[in-house]
Amino acid sequence: MEGNQAGSSLDSLIASFNKRIGELQELVIARNMYPASTIPDLSAIDTALSSMELQVQSIKDRLREETEAIPKAKKLIEASLKQQGKLQKMSIYAPSHFPDKATMLNSDLNRCLLQENAKQYEQHSTLSSLKFDEEAAVLPKEKKGRGSPPLWYITVEELNSLSSYMRGRLTLEKVNAAINDMASYAEANAHLIAASKQKLAENLWEKALKLRDIVTEQAVKGKHFFLETDMKGPSLKLDNTGKAILTVLRHLGRISETRIGQNRVIILMKPH
C-alpha cells in the first residue's frame, strides 16, 4: 500500500514537471523573437530542468530502496509473531503469582526468634543445660534430612481433563498460586519442627510440640505437610474456593489427606 501511494505521488510530480516543461517551451518560443536577450534565461531554464531531473531520480532511488525493504520487514514481522506465539504458550504453564517463601513464614515465628535470641544471653548456664536436656528428650529424629517443599504445578491439560463441575471457576493461575502457598505452609512447619525451644515463644512451642507428634506418624514420615488450620492465604484459604482447590489437587495426585488426632493433615505428594 505504501508503494502504491509513493507511485501515485511520483506520477503527480511527473505530471507537474511535464506541465512546467510545456510552459517553458512556450516561453522559449516567445523569447526566440529576441535571441540575444534570451540566452541568460535559457541557461537558467536549463539549470532548473537539470535540478528537477536530479530530484526525480532521487525520488525514484528512494522508492526503490523502500520497495526492496518491504520483504525484509515482512519476514521480521512473521518472526516476531512466531516468537509472540511461543511466549504466549509458555505463559500458560507459568503461574502468575510467585510469593517469596521467606515472607510467607509465620511473622510471629520470626519476631519470637529475635526476642528469644536476646534472652538466651541472660539465662543461667545450669538452666540452659536443663532445657537442652528437655529438648533432646522431646525432639523426634524425623526433623533432619528434609529439603525444601516441592512445587509440582499442574498443567493446562490436567486442568482441562477435569469435569466442568469439579473445575468450576478455577483457573490455572489460581491453582498454581495455591501450590505456592501450600509449599510455604509446609516450609513454615518444617522450621517449627527443627527450631529449638529457646528460639520459640510459648504459643509457637505448643504448636511445634503438636507438629513433632504428628511427624512421628507413619503416614507423614519423611514428607512435607501442613494442617488445615494453616490455610490463611493469600491464595489458599479455608473457604469454598480453597476447598475446591484441595479437591482438584487431591484428584490430580498433588496432595493426600489424613486425620491425626484432632488435626486434618494435608500431605504434599509427587504426581504419578
UniProtKB/Swiss-Prot annotation:
Classification via Pfam families: SKA1
Source superkingdom: Eukaryota
Coiled coil: 48-75
GO biological process, one term: attachment of mitotic spindle microtubules to kinetochore
Entry keyword set: Coiled coil
Molecular function, one GO term: microtubule binding
Similarity remark: Belongs to the SKA1 family.
Record protein name field: SKA complex subunit 1 homolog
Species the sequence originates in: Arabidopsis thaliana (Mouse-ear cress)
